[in-house]
Amino acid sequence: MEELQGYLEIDRSRQQHFLYPLLFQEYIYALAHDHGLNGSIFYEPMENFGYDNKSSSLIVKRLITRMHQQNHVILSVNDSNESIFVGHNKNFYFQMVSEGFAVIMEIPFSLRLVSSLEEKEIAKSHNSRSIHSIFPFFEDKLSHLNHVSDILIPHPIHLEILVQTLHCWIQDAPSLHLLRFFLHEYRNSNSLITPKKSISLFSKENQRFFLLLYNSHVYECESVLVFLRKQSSHLRSTSSGTFLERTHFYGKIEHLVVVLRNDFQKTLWLFKDPFMHYVRYQGKSILASKGTHLLMKKWKSHLVHFWQCHFYLWSLPDRIHINQLYNHFLYFLGYLSSVRLNTSVVGIQMLENSFLIDTSINKFETLVPIIPLIGSVAKAKFCNVSGHPISKSVRADSSDSDIINRFGRIYRNLSHYHSGSSKKQTLYRIKYILRLSCARTLARKHKSTVRAFLKRLGSEFLEEFLTEEEQVLSLIFQRTSSPSYRSHRERIWYLDIIRINDLANHS
């Protein structure tokens, strides 16, 4: 039990007590704007945060002056008539303050992240940020495992849970009051996390703010996994301990310590599995194991009860699905992944005797589901729900080359993300939809027919929809007898993809 108490030890020297005064500093808002340009700790591009050119120094000074004059905003949560966010710029001022607040709240987390990387001597690498790096890991590990659990991270049932989560790391009462104010404002505008909304549906104008809250909440829920994994295995754990310093977690788990004081090691023995692997992206996580179905049920039961009893989160058991890898498709990051048993017959000739040997190899396959992807393309108005291409409205001053480049860029981005698919028929279907949609858009602009327009452009139009990997593969396999066959089956994982394309994110 000493190990558990040491793991939950409070590190008071790293708590941040005076963050709220930073909200009145101009450089914080400049920093928020620069982070939007260069990417924040969560590696999101500027356009996702809703920033525009309005963030001038004059507006920032005007906002800070107003906050100085009405500093009681943090105390007026229950009084909707008292707020600094009034007038025709209410939404913009509110967005600016929430963005600045999010940058301030990121400070302790970024410091701990840097400290953790230095302690573990982990080199900063952009490749490690790629979400495509998950699939080579799957390909190497999942083919040797038996069961997989699809886990949906539980949502908070009350706004105060989010506040208390940050309270575990930040001892700054004014900042916490301001956080409550923001949450109540967003609750009134129906922009908060709900069981029916995923992180991709957060308010585009304040995504940094929600990412901060969501990540802190998720890491709090995952803490039990990290602890049990470290205690139940002698193998080296690569899980990050950056977000595991909490001030109130010990109090929440005190009852568990008393109950399991005598049987703690026996309880940990139930979770021993040297072949356990855990991966998460956004609100979905995967727990894969070589163990039995009974072991996976024990993990499921423990997680559900722990979330319910010690984090005050209602997590329904049906949010964790246990399946065998051999007869189940795993839907993750826009791919349908599975492990298939490939059987082949090998003939062996030894002097006068010949043998036929059956060999079976587990093969990891990744497919792109056609129906959800067509649904995403239809939602973007490139086709109807049946997959028939339609024309899009464009600006009258848009040139033909700009329109063609735009459609070609969309397809190349989609193909780039789904380049790891074992079969490319889905991508060929999407290419057909985007090409014909582009042709119909141009024909509509010039008041012509699609046939006449394609005849005029010829092969130049088709080359815009050639992807980089298709061009590279054509050079690599140009001496083979069937380059199209090889490129059709080739899987490529890229290490420069740090987020899901909006069209690819059809979850």
Curated annotation (Swiss-Prot):
Pfam families: Intron_maturas2, MatK_N
A molecular-function term among this protein's GO annotations: RNA binding
Compartments, as annotated in UniProt: Plastid, Chloroplast
Keywords per UniProt: Chloroplast, mRNA processing, Plastid, RNA-binding, tRNA processing
Gene Ontology CC terms: chloroplast
GO BP: any one term: tRNA processing
Function, as annotated: Usually encoded in the trnK tRNA gene intron. Probably assists in splicing its own and other chloroplast group II introns.
PANTHER family: MATURASE K
Family recorded in the similarity comment: Belongs to the intron maturase 2 family. MatK subfamily.
Name recorded for this polypeptide: Maturase K
Natural source organism: Magnolia figo (Banana shrub)
Gene name for this UniProt entry: matK
